[in-house]
Amino acid sequence: MTLLALGINHKTATIEVREQVAFTPAELAGALAELKSLPGVNEAAVLSTCNRTELYCVTDSQGEREVLDWLGRFHALPPETLMQSAYHYLDGEAARHLMRVAAGLDSMVLGEPQILGQLKEAYQLARDNAGLGGELERLFQHTFSVAKQVRSETGIGENPVSVAYAAVSLASHIFDDFGRARALLIGAGETIELVARHLREAGIRGLTVANRTRERAELLAHEVDAEAISLGEIPQALAHADIIISSTASPLPILGKGMVESALKKRRHRPMFMVDIAVPRDIESQVGELDDVFLYSVDDLQEVIEENRKQRAVAAAQAESLIEHGIQHWQHERRVRGAGDLIRRYREQGEALREEAERQALAQLARGEDPEKVLQRLSRQLTNKLLHGPTLRLREASGEARHDILKAADTLLIDPAASTQDSA
C-alpha cells in the first residue's frame, strides 16, 4: 500500500488555476466517491480551500498520474494546466506534508489556525462517505494530535494572524481615519467572522454583513454588533461601503462591474477598497479596472503575510522539530503494523505444528503407551519441526554468503538471556 498526497496550492498555482480546481461544497461528496472508485484507490479524502486543493489517497501502487488525470477530468481541464502546478508526495513525505498543512506551516499565513478546522471537515466528510480505511484514519488522528501539540508547545498560534487579519491590516493602512470607515462583509463563514472581529478591534465605525441566508447573517451580526442584510440588498448597501471584503462559496461572482459602477456614482466616486478572499472569486476581475476601486485578491495579501512569516520563524523551527518527531512515531507504528501479517502467518504455522503433534500424542496415549515416553517424543517432534525450516534456510544463506540474513537470524532467533544462562 502507498500513501499519496497530491494537489496544488497558493505557492504552485495562480488564483485563476486554483479556482478552476476548487471543489464547491455541493461537489465534494460526489468527487470523493469518484476518486475512491478509481482502480487501485482504496482510501481517499479531499481538502479544498481558497488556497489549496489536495487529495489524500491510499493506493495499491503509487498512482499519482491516475489521480492527477482524474482531477483534470473532473474539472474539465487540459492535462498541461495541472502538470505545471501539481505536486505529489509518497508515504513518509506525504504524511509529513499533511502534518505541516495541519500545523499551518504550509499556509500563506504561517501558523494560521483555520486550516486545521478545514482539514477536520475534510476528514469528517471522508469518514461519513466511506472514504477512510485504517491507514488514513490513523494518519489523520495522529496528524490532529501533532498539530495540537505544535499549537500548544510553540508560539506559532500566538497573536492569531490569518488571511482575514491580513485583509484588515491592509485596509487599516489605506484609510487614514479607520474609525470613520464603513465596511460591507459578504458571507458569514469562519473567515468573514474573523474579518468582522478584527475590524471591530481596529475600531471600524459601521459594519454590515450580507449572506445568502439572512438568518446566518443575523446570527453573525448579533455577535459583532453589525447590520444584517441578504445578498439581494447588496446593490443598495454597496454605495455606503468604503471597505468590501467577500468570502463565500458561490460558484459565480456576486459583485459585477456594472453594480460597482452604479455604487460609485451614488458615492460621487469616493474610493472603495475591496478584498476578494473567495475561490472561485466573488468579485469580477473587471471591477479592478474602475478608477476609484482598489481590488485585492488573496494573492495580493502576500506582502502583509510575509511580514507575519518573519515574526514566526522561530516558532516554525520548533514546530518543524515536533513534526519530525511525529513523523518518526507514525513511521514506527506503520512498520509495526506492516509486520502484523508476517507475525500472524508465523503463529498460524506454529499452531498447525502444535495441533498435529498434540493429535499424535493423544492417539499414542489412547493406545496405552507410556505417558513419559509420549511426552519426550512430543517435545522432540515439536523442536525438530519448528527448527527444520529455519535451519535449512540458514544453511542456504551461509552457502550463498548472505551475511545480512545470518545477522538478522542471530537477532531474531537467538535469545541473549538464554545464551548467558547456558554459558553459566
Curated annotation (Swiss-Prot):
GO terms for molecular function: glutamyl-tRNA reductase activity; NADP binding. It catalyses: (S)-4-amino-5-oxopentanoate + tRNA(Glu) + NADP(+) = L-glutamyl-tRNA(Glu) + NADPH + H(+). InterPro entries: 4pyrrol_synth_GluRdtase, 4pyrrol_synth_GluRdtase_dimer, 4pyrrol_synth_GluRdtase_N, GluRdtase_CS, GluRdtase_dimer_dom_sf, GluRdtase_N_sf, NAD(P)-bd_dom_sf, Shikm_DH/Glu-tRNA_Rdtase. Pathway: Porphyrin-containing compound metabolism; protoporphyrin-IX biosynthesis; 5-aminolevulinate from L-glutamyl-tRNA(Glu): step 1/2. The record marks H97 as: Important for activity. Gene3D superfamilies: Glutamyl-tRNA reductase, N-terminal domain, NAD(P)-binding Rossmann-like Domain. Keywords: NADP, Oxidoreductase, Porphyrin biosynthesis. Substrate binds at T49, C50, N51, R52, S107, E112, P113, Q114, Q118. Its EC number is 1.2.1.70. It comes from the Bacteria. NADP(+) binds at G187, A188, G189, E190, T191, I192. The active site is at C50. GO terms for biological process: protoporphyrinogen IX biosynthetic process from glutamate. The keyword Metal-binding does not apply. Possesses an unusual extended V-shaped dimeric structure with each monomer consisting of three distinct domains arranged along a curved 'spinal' alpha-helix. The N-terminal catalytic domain specifically recognizes the glutamate moiety of the substrate. The second domain is the NADPH-binding domain, and the third C-terminal domain is responsible for dimerization. Catalyzes the NADPH-dependent reduction of glutamyl-tRNA(Glu) to glutamate 1-semialdehyde (GSA). During catalysis, the active site Cys acts as a nucleophile attacking the alpha-carbonyl group of tRNA-bound glutamate with the formation of a thioester intermediate between enzyme and glutamate, and the concomitant release of tRNA(Glu). The thioester intermediate is finally reduced by direct hydride transfer from NADPH, to form the product GSA. Belongs to the glutamyl-tRNA reductase family. PANTHER family: GLUTAMYL-TRNA REDUCTASE. Homodimer. This is Glutamyl-tRNA reductase. The lineage of its organism: Bacteria, Pseudomonadati, Pseudomonadota, Gammaproteobacteria, Oceanospirillales. The gene is hemA.
